[in-house]
Amino acid sequence: MPLKWSLLLGTFVLISCSSVEAAVTVGRACKVTDTMPGICRTSSDCEPLIDGYIKSGVLTLNDVPSCGLGAWGEIFCCPTKPCCDNSTITSVSTSSTTSTKAPMTSGRVDVPTFGSGDRPAVAACKKIRERKQQRSGNQLVIHIVGGYPVDPGVYPHMAAIGYITFGTDFRCGGSLIASRFVLTAAHCVNTDANTPAFVRLGAVNIENPDHSYQDIVIRSVKIHPQYVGNKYNDIAILELERDVVETDNIRPACLHTDATDPPSNSKFFVAGWGVLNVTTRARSKILLRAGLELVPLDQCNISYAEQPGSIRLLKQGVIDSLLCAIDQKLIADACKGDSGGPLIHELNVEDGMYTIMGVISSGFGCATVTPGLYTRVSSYLDFIEGIVWPDNRV
């Protein structure tokens, strides 16, 4: 059956397995490893048990299997008993609103020089990491994020963009990249009927956030000057009315500034509040994430060339300012509702270091054989820095 471009044109949301099937898995027997029996538990029940295994080096976060997606979040295969007496535990260390087109900037400049100093995005990232280190010290914070749900503080840059029509509606996501600026997709904010009102930060449950969340009014919207409604230059910046108050759950993220793609074994994730099932369109109230793999642009071009109608929106093909990513199992993807959210390059899961490599833009269907399209952040550093850090002030 042919795929419809209406799915591509909508905003994106995270897709995962059916929650109906997975909701009955709590308490079911499972295997953590071939030699370690387990039982399916919620993340809140599993985390205290798994903590000792991770600190002892017996398991890593990525070793914890998923039993499926329950009604309220991911269900994990958890060891049946706590790990390790004190004699077996080894130490673990850690390493340190108005909508307008922005002024025209020059073309892609990935690695310009700024005298003897760093470009603003790099300097800002160093400050973000310094503040994170000061806040967390050398304490290792364990979060169960190997599956779909995301615990508070794991992705403190995540922003939900609120629209007020006949009530509050969160249609797109974004990433906090500085104390007063959120990065998102241009198609989320490019019409009068699609004007965002505020951003919600620090919330995992988007409809029932805890006391630590912050809602901040959007002062202005800056759309890339070369965005004309197709799949190119799909990037925008929201300026907030005030600076955020940084907490453990609210903090800017680093931008990916390297023009080259990371090694093939790198870990990539998309995150957002989204639909659990493409048929019912029922949305998750909690922040979800899913692991993806980058697809080389030549392969991505072949995939899109096979889709009818793609030439209309991708007249130049899949070019260097885009990224392509896919879940090879065709289970997880971004789809309607998560546009503007991040494609995250995870550097170190233990100390929570990552960069925003892409902005969720579009795709051909959801969790299909055609990869999703993402705006490559490193192609737009001049645009971002000119708004967020004018005159190279960080």
UniProtKB/Swiss-Prot annotation:
Its EC number is 3.4.21.-. Disulfide bonds join C30-C77, C40-C67, C46-C78, C125-C254, C172-C188, C300-C324, C335-C366. Pfam families: Trypsin. GO terms for molecular function: peptidase activity; serine-type endopeptidase activity. It comes from the Eukaryota. Changing T11I: In strain: G187. Residues 1-22 form the signal peptide. Glycans are attached at N86, N277, N301. The active site is at H187, D234, S339. The keyword Transport does not apply. Residues 29-78 form the Clip domain. The keyword Glycoprotein applies. PROSITE patterns: CLIP (PS51888), TRYPSIN_DOM (PS50240), TRYPSIN_HIS (PS00134), TRYPSIN_SER (PS00135). GO terms for biological process: antifungal innate immune response; cellular response to molecule of bacterial origin; defense response to fungus; defense response to Gram-positive bacterium; innate immune response; positive regulation of antibacterial peptide biosynthetic process; positive regulation of antifungal peptide production; positive regulation of melanization defense response. Keywords: Disulfide bond, Glycoprotein, Hydrolase, Immunity, Innate immunity, Protease, Secreted, Serine protease, Signal. Disruption phenotype: Increased susceptibility to fungal infection and failure to induce the expression of antifungal peptide Drs in response to fungal infection but not in response to E.coli or M.luteus bacterial infection. It is an enzyme of class 3 (hydrolase). Belongs to the peptidase S1 family. CLIP subfamily. This is Serine protease persephone. It comes from Drosophila melanogaster. The gene is psh.
